[in-house]
Amino acid sequence: MAQIQAQEEIVQTVWNNIRAEAREMMTQEPMLGSFFLQSILNQQTFAAALGFQLANRLASAVMPAVVLRELINEVYNKDPNVITAAALDLRAVVDRDPAVVYYSSPLLYLKGFLAIQSYRVAHYLWIEGRHEIAYFMQNLISITFGVD
C-alpha cells in the first residue's frame, strides 16, 4: 500500500510541475497558448497528457490518433507501473541533462523520451500476447522517432 502511494505521489509531483510550467510558458509565449492547452492544461492526468502526445505523434493514415490513444490508455489503466516508470524517466532527464530545465520539455519535445515511453506500451502489448499490434507499434515508433 505504501509503495503504491509513493508511486502515485511521484507521478502527481511530476504532473504538478508540468502543469505549473505550462501555465508560466503560456504567459511567456502567448502564440503557443493553444499548444500548451491541448497538450497539457486540458489533460486531467500525466497519463492522459502522455497518451495524447504519443497518440498524436504515432498516428498514421491507417491508425488514427483516437484509436492509438484508446490503446495507450488501455495499457496505462491495466498497468499503472508504466506511468510511474515514465514519471521517473522524466525526472531523471531533468536531473541529469543540464540542457533540460523544465519537466515539460521531455514530454513535449524530446523524441528519445517519447520513443522510450512508446516502447513501454508496445512491450506491454507484446507481453500480453498481442504481438501483431506490438509489431505495428514498433514500426510506427521506428518511423516516427528514428529509433529501433
Regions found by a protein language model. Name each.
Residues M1-L140:
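Terminal amphipathic alpha-helical/low-complexity segments used for targeting or macromolecular assembly
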Residues Q138, V147-D148:
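A short, contiguous structural element within a folded domain that forms the immediate neighborhood
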Residues I143-F145:
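Left-handed beta-helix
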